[in-house]
């Protein structure tokens, strides 16, 4: 959520920045709403003051033994006008808030202006894609040959875009998540958290999934519990519960940065992606991810973005998977992001790089929604924190990359060196 003071006092500058990311801000509507809000604010304050004055006059008249009925009727009439003005002001303020919640974050000045992924800028590459002297198989064929990926069973159990993993493939999937968590907690300084996979609507508003992206979520309403508290949604990413841990909190400055990580399943309806990536593990309704979140002081957040992205890169480097780092343009960034790097891993069967991590600085956009603040240790004033998040990594897509990049001519998969301690020393699977 953008700073309301910016929307009031720097509207043209805000509109220009939003236009860079293809968002047209209706400046005239906002101006009209703000003018009407000021009028109603003055009107309610004036009516309140007048009613208070008349109420005092009633007391004085009563003490003098005068007839107070005319004054009482006047106070009642003022009260009705005040209630009507307050109701109109509340309605208008809700409309202003709803509009503010629909406005995306402002892009940082370092973000390239563009319309879509074609305008993203490649920052760097790491590793060289391997040359094969045999026909490369995709991860679906390799997983099925190993008896470890069963999409038909998942269709029977649930439906499309789900998978059942078995045996050595399931073990490698588990090994990847354990390796990632150990790296982030032991080497990168993150605190591991176990979080709920179901969250309430306040949590989803806090990180920006609601109200705009409700159709992307799986919503639940238990039949046995008819109450407001039973309107939960499955998390689309651990960013949601991890970041909301600081909602309505005031942190001490010395506790920052706060670095959190969690391994969770993630659930997405994939609305609007019909027909895309229908084969395999690339785009699933349920997938595992190790998420990283940082809560920082405003002046530290851009450096934290570089650090957090580097932590995701380290996973790929230790797995020896070729990848490239891409700076997203204004038209390709997520709703709440001020600046985003994507990491794209090389997939031999597709002969291209595919996204495996997205690392974003959300600036104070989420913090304002959550009222997440810290207390400055010098002046003891409270300020909004900055929030950052990144995949470290998407476990299923990392499994895809390992299967394809480490495949052998006979269909076996070589186990990356860093995973062998998690797999009982196995050198090959399949």
Swiss-Prot record:
Keywords: Aminoacyl-tRNA synthetase, ATP-binding, Cytoplasm, Ligase, Nucleotide-binding, Protein biosynthesis. It is found in: Cytoplasm. Its EC number is 6.1.1.11. It is an enzyme of class 6 (ligase). InterPro entries: aa-tRNA-synt_IIb, aa-tRNA-synth_II, aa-tRNA-synth_II/BPL/LPL, Ser-tRNA-ligase_type_1, Ser-tRNA-synth_1_N, SerRS_1_N_sf, SerRS_core, tRNA-bd_arm. It catalyses: tRNA(Ser) + L-serine + ATP = L-seryl-tRNA(Ser) + AMP + diphosphate + H(+); tRNA(Sec) + L-serine + ATP = L-seryl-tRNA(Sec) + AMP + diphosphate + H(+). GO terms for cellular component: cytoplasm. SUPFAM superfamilies: Class II aaRS and biotin synthetases, tRNA-binding arm. Pathway: Aminoacyl-tRNA biosynthesis; selenocysteinyl-tRNA(Sec) biosynthesis; L-seryl-tRNA(Sec) from L-serine and tRNA(Sec): step 1/1. Catalyzes the attachment of serine to tRNA(Ser). Is also able to aminoacylate tRNA(Sec) with serine, to form the misacylated tRNA L-seryl-tRNA(Sec), which will be further converted into selenocysteinyl-tRNA(Sec). NCBIfam families: serS (TIGR00414). Homodimer. The tRNA molecule binds across the dimer. Belongs to the class-II aminoacyl-tRNA synthetase family. Type-1 seryl-tRNA synthetase subfamily. This is Serine--tRNA ligase. It comes from Yersinia pestis.
């Amino acid at each position: 959520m953008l700073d309301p003071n910016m929307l009031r006092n720097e509207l043209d500058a805000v509109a220009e920045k939003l236009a860079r990311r293809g968002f047209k801000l209706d400046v005239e509507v906002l101006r009209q709403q703000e003018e009407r809000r000021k009028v109603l604010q003055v009107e309610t304050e004036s009516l309140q003051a007048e009613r208070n004055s008349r109420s005092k006059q009633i007391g004085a008249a009563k003490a003098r033994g005068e007839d107070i009925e005319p004054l009482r009727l006047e106070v009642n009439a003022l009260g009705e006008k005040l209630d009507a003005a307050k109701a109109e002001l509340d309605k208008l303020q809700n409309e202003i808030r709803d509009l503010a919640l629909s406005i995306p974050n402002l892009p940082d000045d370092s973000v390239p202006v563009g319309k879509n992924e074609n305008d993203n800028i490649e920052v760097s590459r790491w590793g060289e894609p391997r040359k094969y002297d045999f026909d490369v198989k995709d991860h679906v064929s390799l997983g099925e040959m190993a008896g470890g990926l069963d999409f038909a069973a998942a269709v029977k159990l649930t439906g499309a875009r789900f998978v059942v993993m078995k045996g050595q493939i399931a073990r490698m999937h588990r090994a990847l998540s354990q390796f990632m968590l150990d790296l982030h907690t032991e080497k990168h300084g993150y605190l591991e958290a176990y979080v709920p996979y179901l969250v309430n609507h306040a949590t989803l508003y806090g990180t920006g999934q609601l109200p705009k992206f409700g159709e992307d979520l799986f919503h639940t309403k238990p039949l046995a519990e008819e109450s407001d508290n039973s309107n939960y949604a499955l998390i689309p990413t651990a960013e949601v519960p991890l970041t909301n841990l600081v909602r309505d909190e005031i942190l001490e400055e010395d506790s920052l940065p706060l670095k959190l990580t969690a391994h969770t399943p993630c659930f997405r309806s994939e609305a609007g992606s019909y027909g895309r990536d229908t084969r395999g593990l690339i785009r699933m309704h349920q997938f595992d991810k190790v998420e990283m979140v940082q809560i920082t002081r405003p002046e530290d957040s851009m450096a934290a973005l570089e650090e957090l992205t580097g932590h995701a890169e380290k996973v790929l480097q230790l797995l020896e998977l070729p990848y490239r780092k891409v700076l997203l343009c204004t038209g390709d960034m997520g709703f709440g992001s001020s600046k985003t790097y994507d990491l794209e891993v090389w997939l031999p069967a597709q002969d291209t790089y595919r996204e495996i991590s997205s690392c974003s600085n959300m600036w104070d956009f989420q913090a304002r929604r959550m009222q997440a603040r810290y207390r400055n240790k010098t002046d003891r004033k409270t300020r909004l924190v900055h929030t950052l998040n990144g995949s470290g990594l998407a476990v299923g897509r990392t499994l895809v990359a390992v299967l394809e990049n480490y495949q052998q001519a006979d269909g076996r998969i070589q186990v990356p060196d860093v995973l062998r301690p998690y797999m009982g020393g196995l050198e090959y699977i399949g």
